[in-house]
C-alpha cells in the first residue's frame, strides 16, 4: 500500500518544488547571464592588469576608457534585464531587487576604480581592486544562481 502511494507523493513533491522556483526566483535569462559574464570577465582582466602594475601611472587611464565603458555598458544592460524580469510572486520580486542591487553595486565599484585610475593611477597590492572584485563576483553569482 505504501509503495503505491509513494510514487504519487514523489511526483507531487517534485511538482511543488518546481512550482516554488517560480515563486521564489525569477526565470533564467540567458541574455542577463551573458552580459554579467562579459562584465565580470572584463572586471577580472582589469583587476589582474592593475595588480600587475600596468596602471600605476594615471596617464594610462585614457587607454582604458573603452574597457571601463564596455564593462559599464554590460552592467547597465544586465541591470535593466534583471529589473524587468517577470515574476510570479513577491518573494521572486525580492530576489530580482537583490540581483539589481548587486549589479548596481558592481557598477559603482567599477566607477570608483575608474576615478581612482584617472586621478592618481592604481598602485598594486594596496587592495584598490578588491572591493570591485568582491562586489562583481557577488553580482555574477546572483545571476548565475538563477540557472
Predicted ranges, named:
Residues 1-12:
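Bacterial N-terminal signal peptides that target proteins for export
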Residues 17-20:
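C-terminal motif of bacterial Sec signal peptides marking the signal peptidase cleavage site
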Residues 22-24:
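Bacterial signal peptide processing site
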Residues 28-51:
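Post-signal peptide N-terminal segment of mature Sec-exported envelope proteins
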Residues 48-90:
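Alpha-helical segments in soluble extracytoplasmic regions
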Residues 58-69, 93-97, 123-130, 134:
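Short, charged, amphipathic alpha-helical segments
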Residues 72-126:
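Long, amphipathic, charge-rich alpha-helical segments that form helical bundles/coiled-coils
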Residues 116-147:
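A charged, solvent-exposed segment within the mature domains of Sec-exported extracytoplasmic proteins
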Amino acid at each position: 500500500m505504501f509503495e503505491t502511494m509513494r510514487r504519487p507523493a514523489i511526483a507531487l513533491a517534485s511538482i511543488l518544488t518546481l512550482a516554488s522556483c517560480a515563486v521564489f526566483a525569477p526565470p533564467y535569462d540567458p541574455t542577463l547571464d551573458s552580459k554579467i559574464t562579459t562584465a565580470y570577465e572584463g572586471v577580472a582582466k582589469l583587476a589582474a592588469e592593475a595588480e600587475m602594475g600596468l596602471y600605476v601611472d594615471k596617464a594610462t587611464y585614457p587607454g582604458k576608457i573603452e574597457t571601463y565603458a564596455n564593462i559599464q555598458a554590460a552592467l547597465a544592460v544586465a541591470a535593466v534585464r534583471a529589473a524587468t524580469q517577470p515574476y510570479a510572486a513577491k518573494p521572486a520580486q525580492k530576489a530580482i531587487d537583490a540581483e539589481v542591487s548587486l549589479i548596481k553595486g558592481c557598477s559603482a565599484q567599477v566607477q570608483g576604480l575608474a576615478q581612482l585610475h584617472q586621478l592618481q593611477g592604481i598602485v598594486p597590492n594596496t587592495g584598490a581592486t578588491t572591493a570591485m572584485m568582491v562586489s562583481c563576483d557577488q553580482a555574477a553569482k546572483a545571476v548565475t544562481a538563477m540557472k
